[in-house]
């Protein structure tokens, strides 16, 4: 069983006296599992028989190829050619469709809302997360989250805590009012306040104005120990937040690019500067876009950027590769929303989650901010459509999407069917 003898099931031969002959029967298996044999031999008046079985394993090597794309309307044609010289019992064409690229972001928000430490950066990150995903989570009715009124109350409580921590210079310390104001923490808190205000949360005007004044003088607040790389990155972040506050300093952004050179910035800084420069007609914006396009690591389905920083600078910037991807994704959505890199960056970020979230507060916040912009750019309209799949003239599947869901719909066409036709299908 589970075997086909391709040259017949019987043979006749002569066996010399006191000798032996090897008899071979060409065969092929039907499927993985077990192949069972019964063998009989007859010579004159004598006969004998035996029974045995052999394990049949899947092929030792496999190969997969994926193509990803986005369809807004109309149809998409993708030629398919079945590979030759393969085991048709294995593999096939798998087609997956979804009405959204955002897959269950609840865990990332829960991680931030339940975070047990409350320094100024962590409070700001919690505000940013809730503000950023307010539209997305309400649209998808995300399970597991506290009621919206509890999340709103948490943001209001965190804003009040931060207001109580703000120093007289407008800056924010790490833990307690009266301690040294830290440039990064101050920029990050100001970022949280403006994002919260954009989403309809109440932010004290005097609190935001004092933080903005600190940002305008940010370079005078850098300790002498800060490296040039740290200073340039923090200045870029402050310019980005000022732009969100309608205080865009285009001249300083251009001078910064001219002083440092595009190739000498950290990727994070380039993402922030791109968002500041792109609305203008200055040449620096396209220069940054070209540089980023030449530094992306791209596969058929995903994309990411890699960056590095000195270990001694890490705690001053709280940097990571995933955060960099989120920052650049947000910038590309703002300046080049039709870029083919955007859906790839989204898939790459979603694929790098562990237990539904990213590695730390900074990664979660900047990625969630970018995904919020992605949602409002590409998925603001509630899905209501039918997706149909054809292979050549053969109807394959139909998927109906009504309302928001993060589910995938998948159909598999076996290799045995694909191999029946040569050439493109």
Which residue ranges define each predicted feature?
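Long, domain-scale non-catalytic interaction/scaffolding regions in large secretory-pathway
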Residues: 2-23, 27-52, 60, 77-86, ...
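Extended, solvent-exposed functional surface patches
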Residues: 22-24, 31-229, 235-254, 272-275, ...
């Amino acid at each position: 069983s589970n075997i086909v003898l391709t040259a017949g099931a019987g043979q006749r031969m002569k066996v010399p006296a006191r000798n032996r002959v090897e008899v071979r029967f060409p065969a092929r298996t039907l499927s993985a599992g077990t192949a069972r044999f019964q063998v009989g031999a007859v010579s004159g008046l004598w006969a004998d028989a035996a029974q045995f079985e052999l394990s049949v394993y899947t092929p030792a090597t496999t190969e997969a190829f994926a193509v990803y794309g986005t369809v807004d309307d109309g149809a998409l044609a993708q030629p398919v050619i079945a590979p030759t010289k393969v085991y048709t019992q294995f593999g096939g064409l798998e087609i997956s469709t979804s009405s959204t690229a955002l897959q269950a972001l609840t865990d990332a928000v829960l991680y931030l809302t339940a975070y047990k430490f409350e320094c100024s950066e962590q409070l700001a990150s919690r505000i940013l997360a809730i503000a950023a995903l307010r539209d997305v989570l309400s649209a998808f009715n995300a399970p597991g989250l506290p009621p919206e009124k509890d999340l709103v109350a948490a943001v209001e409580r965190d804003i009040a805590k931060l207001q109580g921590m703000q120093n007289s210079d407008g800056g924010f310390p790490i833990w307690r009012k009266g301690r040294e104001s830290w440039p990064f923490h101050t920029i990050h808190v100001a970022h949280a306040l403006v994002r919260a205000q954009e989403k309809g949360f109440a932010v004290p005007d005097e609190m935001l104005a004092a933080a903005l004044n600190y940002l305008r003088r940010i370079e005078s607040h850098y300790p002498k120990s800060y490296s040039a790389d740290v200073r340039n990155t923090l200045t870029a972040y402050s310019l980005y937040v000022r732009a969100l506050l309608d205080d865009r300093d285009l001249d300083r952004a251009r001078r910064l690019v001219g002083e440092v050179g595009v190739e000498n910035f950290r990727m994070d800084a380039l993402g922030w500067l791109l968002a500041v420069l792109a609305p203008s007609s200055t040449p620096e914006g396209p220069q940054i876009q070209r540089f980023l396009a030449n530094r992306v690591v791209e596969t058929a389905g995903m994309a990411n950027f890699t960056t590095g920083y000195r270990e001694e600078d890490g705690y001053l910037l709280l940097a990571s590769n995933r955060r960099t991807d989120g920052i650049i994704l947000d910038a590309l959505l703002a300046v080049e929303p039709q870029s083919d890199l955007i859906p790839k960056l989204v898939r790459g970020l979603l694929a790098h989650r562990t237990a539904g979230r990213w590695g730390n507060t900074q990664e979660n916040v900047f990625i969630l901010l970018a995904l919020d912009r992605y949602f409002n750019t590409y998925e603001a309209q509630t899905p209501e459509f039918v997706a149909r799949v054809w292979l050549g003239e053969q109807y394959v599947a139909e998927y109906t999407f009504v309302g928001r869901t993060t589910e995938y719909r998948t159909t598999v066409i076996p290799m045995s069917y694909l191999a029946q036709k040569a050439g493109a299908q």
